[in-house]
């Protein structure tokens, strides 16, 4: 199973908004762009709320204040990291319900759960301590804010259902102690990822229960949804491919890959985004992987959940 919370470094990102974030992992001419929204106290501090637009995103990429155009952090053009892309993924059963099952309420529940997790994650935003005795240390100090943009995608590049979020964080955080913007240090946020995963799973399972589904087996790796679990392997082609690469690595190196090495395997083996494939075509391909009986069973499960009164 792939890690449900990962982070990647974006060093330039000049095309990242248009070519990656605004597009799903497939794309067709005329396809509606994926809409994003601003997140974080840092975003609000520079006047960013609501829908993501191009100009302020570009300002953050270039280390500029979106309203004034002034340089944010002192490193300016020398700063090699533009963004930190934090990715949060839903358990496979949830992705199947939201996409193949067509229950938009599940997609909304995932989005709401992600926002709760990101609010928790923001508490761990930090800067490197560079004052006094700590001037030359590698210690961090929490700032509790970041400026980011949130985008939701719903498929892997193998076209498996894979509901996931990109929280793209600008490499800047406001340090109240020094009254200025400094480079964002993600180490504490990543160190908190086991806790944050549990927050995501608990929030999402609770919301699914209120929608009429039966999540069960909550643990550190996720949870299952009754009536969907038998379809999980069918739509896990990407996970199987990564597991195969990890097994080959183990045979070659005589040891299992580290988490960082798995992330590299994932990145280097990732296929290009598919072009000339529309959302209806993707849904049709996914539905075609189900037998007639499986499709009827999934539709009945979704209809039953929709018919139930919301649960507190």
Explain the meaning of each model-derived region.
Residues 1-312:
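Intrinsically disordered, flexible peripheral segments
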């Amino acid at each position: 199973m792939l890690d449900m919370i990962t982070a990647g470094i974006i060093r330039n990102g000049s095309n990242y908004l248009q070519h990656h974030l605004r597009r799903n992992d497939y794309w067709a001419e005329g396809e509606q762009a994926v809409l994003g929204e601003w997140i974080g106290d840092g975003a609000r501090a520079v006047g960013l709320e609501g829908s993501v637009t191009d100009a302020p995103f570009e300002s953050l990429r270039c280390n500029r204040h979106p309203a004034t155009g002034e340089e944010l952090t002192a490193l300016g053009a020398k700063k090699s990291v533009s963004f930190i892309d934090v990715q949060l993924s839903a358990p496979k059963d949830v992705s199947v319900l939201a996409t193949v099952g067509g229950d938009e309420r599940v997609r909304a529940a995932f989005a709401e759960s992600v926002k709760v997790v990101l609010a928790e994650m923001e508490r761990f935003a930090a800067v490197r301590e560079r004052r006094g005795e700590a001037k030359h240390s590698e210690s961090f100090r929490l700032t509790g804010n970041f400026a980011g943009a949130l985008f939701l995608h719903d498929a892997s590049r193998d076209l498996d259902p894979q509901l996931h979020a990109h929280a793209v964080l600008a490499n800047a955080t406001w340090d109240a102690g020094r009254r200025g913007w400094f480079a964002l240090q993600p180490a504490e946020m990543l160190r908190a990822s086991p806790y944050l995963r549990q927050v995501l799973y608990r929030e999402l399972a609770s919301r699914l229960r209120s929608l009429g589904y039966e999540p069960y087996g909550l643990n550190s790796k996720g949870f299952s949804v009754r009536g969907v679990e038998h379809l999980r392997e069918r739509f896990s082609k990407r996970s199987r491919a990564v597991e195969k690469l990890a097994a080959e690595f183990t045979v070659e190196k005589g040891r299992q890959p580290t988490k960082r090495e798995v992330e590299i395997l994932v990145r280097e083996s990732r296929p290009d985004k598919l072009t000339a494939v529309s959302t209806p075509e993707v849904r049709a391909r996914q539905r075609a992987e189900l037998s007639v009986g499986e499709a009827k069973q999934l539709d009945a499960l979704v209809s039953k959940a929709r018919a139930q009164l919301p649960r507190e």
